Structure formats: structure tokens, C-alpha cells
Amino acid sequence: MKVTFLGHAVVLIEGKKNIIIDPFISGNPVCPVKLEGLPKIDYILVTHGHGDHLGDAVEIAKKNDATVISNYEICHYLGKKGVKTHAMHIGGSYLFDFGRVKMTPAVHGSGILDGDSMIYGGNPSGFLITIEGKKIYHAGDTGLTREMELLAEENVDVAFLPIGGNFVMDVEDAVRAAVMIKPKKVVPMHYGTWELIFADVELFKKKVEEKGVECVILEPGESLEL
């Protein structure tokens, strides 16, 4: 199974089924691929309604007849646009044909910008994905939360954590999160897309590895094999 970081918070999981998380492809200044360069997508996971995460979900879903997995409010919004969805809420889990997805808490917003209007997008979340014998945690956009301590019991193989500050955890808080979660590997995300969320990723790697957590810095387009 191949897990590819496509910049910002976009993660592509290629295995028996292909899954993309927070598919912000068009307009993403650090994404190395275009929509037509994606493989066939079976499922789309959306952590919250902001445009840099909801991204191209509608176009990808319609092109691939893919199912979007997200909270109830986002699924309702997408369903009105003709997209196939599976609604969940935080704390809920469901066994799909590729594995199990559990929605985890995130501290952030989730408004959907639709023209000049902001539509309520439910509660933001992360995802704990159990797939092909591995566990992948994608935190979504979030500040540091005590709930992350519970993830230490999950024996997470790889955790994708935001480190860019301002809207999400900064380097220091992301290190604290990694220490609480205790993943086998941590991959930093949601940094450097724009100047406002610049972060010193090498400093994050140094600090988190001093705490005993292996850090893998993936440049956009680079992959991990799990």
C-alpha cells in the first residue's frame, strides 16, 4: 500500500481501493499533480468544509463515481450536488469494503463558502483509518486536544499532523500531539502552502525525534510504503 503526500493536507492512499483525503488539487500552489493525473478514486474523505480541504471533492466524486465520507452536514451539502456520500459523526466508526474509518475530534471551523454565503459545515474532524492491516491517522485541521492521548491505544502506524500554526497547531504543539499519540511515524502537513502558515519543518523533525517519535518529511509527491 502506497501513501502519497500531495501538499497542504492532501493524502492519497493507493491499495486495493484508492482513497484521497482533503482533495485540494486545483488552486493548491504546492500540489505536484493535476486532477487528470490522479488515479481512479474510490473514496474521498473530507475532514471539514473549508475550501482548502473540501477542494475538488465534487469533481473527483462525479468523475470516478466515488463516495465521499464526511460529517452529516457536508454530506447533505454534497448530496444536493449529485454526489454519492456516506455521512458519519465524531466518535462514530464504520467498516467499509477497504477497512474501518473512525471520525476523531478536531478543534477548528468547518464553514463552506458558497458564493457570497457561508454555509454551516458541521463539526471538523480527523480520521483514523484501519486499512490492509495498518492504521493511518489524519488529524485534519486542529489545535492540540487532550483527546489525542486516546490515540496512543490505537498503535497508529503513521500520523499526519498539521504544524503550520495560525489556523492549526504550531511546531511546539504538534510535537506535544505526536508525543501523546505515539505513532510509529509522524508526517508533518499543512505548512508552507502560503506564507501565513510557514513552519520550520526541520525544527519539528528535530524536536519530535528528541521525544522518540520518528519523523518522515514528505515533499509533495513523495510516498511512504506501508
UniProtKB/Swiss-Prot annotation:
Gene Ontology molecular functions: hydrolase activity
A Pfam family recorded for this sequence: Lactamase_B_2
InterPro entries cross-referenced by the UniProt entry: Metallo-B-lactamas, RibonucZ/Hydroxyglut_hydro, UPF0173, UPF0173_UPF0282_UlaG_hydrolase
Record keywords, A-Z: Hydrolase
Gene3D superfamilies (alphabetical): Ribonuclease Z/Hydroxyacylglutathione hydrolase-like (3.60.15.10)
NCBIfam families: PRK00685.1 (NF001911)
Family: Belongs to the UPF0173 family.
Full protein name: UPF0173 metal-dependent hydrolase TM_1162
